[in-house]
Amino acid sequence: MTKLIDLSHPLEGGQRVFPEDPPISVEIHHTIDSIGYNLTKVSLSSHQGTHLDAPYHFFDNGETVDQIDLHRFYGPATVVDLAPGGALEARTPLTAQSFEPHADLFQPGARILYRTGWDRMFGRPEFFTDSPTLTLGAARWIADRKIGLLGMDTPTPSEDWLECHHILLRSGTEIVIVEGLTRLEQLPEGFVFIGFPANSVSST
């Protein structure tokens, strides 16, 4: 039987989110006793928990989630473990040199996930404030290699979030960014990544 590994964090009402984002709310809307069936009402932004960034997140003329070819979210992938058997310290800079030993994996169209061990901090304030961070030089190094998808176990690629996202999502590069992954240490060297988003029209 094929082994499946869930790389996503659960979504719960009231859990910590990005400081400027709306809170997650999960409410009982109908019950069996009241109307004959149970129904929950879920309210959240498109960037809660494990999620992806479409180019439209940072560019008004960029593709929205529903416009991205589905093949971008599915296919052979590789994990780059930057902290084998452990976890990186808070705010560890991830430089181009961090990825150079794995340069042969960064081929055009490749799907690359990198592990820092920071998913252990999910649910704490530090998850958002102190995560290991791509340097802009590393972001350019990755963008220059024209990979198709970049995933990570941090909530955002870099503390220089605006410029880093611009480098990775700009026209002509448009790398799908998947943030807030977990359990990357369970992945084999090569695997099939499945990360289809909800078909949400005009979503970021």
Where are these regions (language model features)?
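Active-/binding-site microenvironments in catalytic and ligand-binding cores
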Residues: 1-204
